Amino acid sequence: NDENYKSADITYYSPDGTAVSPNGSNGDDDTNESSSTDEYSNYRYSYSTLAKTVMTQALRRNTEFRQASKQRQEVILYAMQYIGNKYVYGGESITDGIDCSAFTRYVMRHFGKKLPRNSYSQRSSGKSVDKPNTGDLICYSGHVAIYIGDGKIIHASNHHAYPRGGIKVSSSYKYRAVRSIRSLFND
């Protein structure tokens, strides 16, 4: 079942036969933040590519996603291509590092939707809704994410290497207190 898929379910092996975790560490240090030029970077890349494939396939079973408008679905599919990209606080580069509000702004701008630069200001964008729909913004204190459907979000999470951080899908939008839910769509 793809929905119960966890990064720990995958073991990669380096060229010398040493088992490495998907984040490129040997499992001894869960805070490994090695650069993308190290010998294990291709394993992280392979893992994020696999994660994108698994997540995209899982969307077919996501009831809310399937029932959403075409534009809302396109927002999610567009955002998901960046799974595994790096998080940088204050960053605005989708390739070199981006923070949560710059990520939501980047994704929505692709669809002609304007958002302010910081998460606090994004809490006032669009219209307030009580229940999230695919493509809506989930606003927290100091953080913002895009709702996928069936309780899941995509967001630029934190500075840790993917899959622990970076741009990723999280399984519950209620993982912390929600301040507001904002819709930028007219449907």
Predicted regions and their residues:
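Intrinsically disordered, low-complexity
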Residues: 1-86, 176-187
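Residues at secondary-structure transition points
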Residues: 23, 96-97, 124, 151
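A broadly tuned, weak detector of single residues within folded domains
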Residues: 37, 72, 97, 138-140
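Solvent-exposed, acidic/flexible segments
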Residues: 65-72, 96-101, 131
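Secreted/periplasmic proteins that engage bacterial cell-wall peptidoglycan
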Residues: 74-118
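...with weaker cross-activation on analogous glycine-rich loops/strands in unrelated enzymes
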Residues: 77, 105, 109-174
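Residues that form or immediately flank small-molecule/cofactor binding pockets and catalytic motifs
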Residues: 92, 158, 186
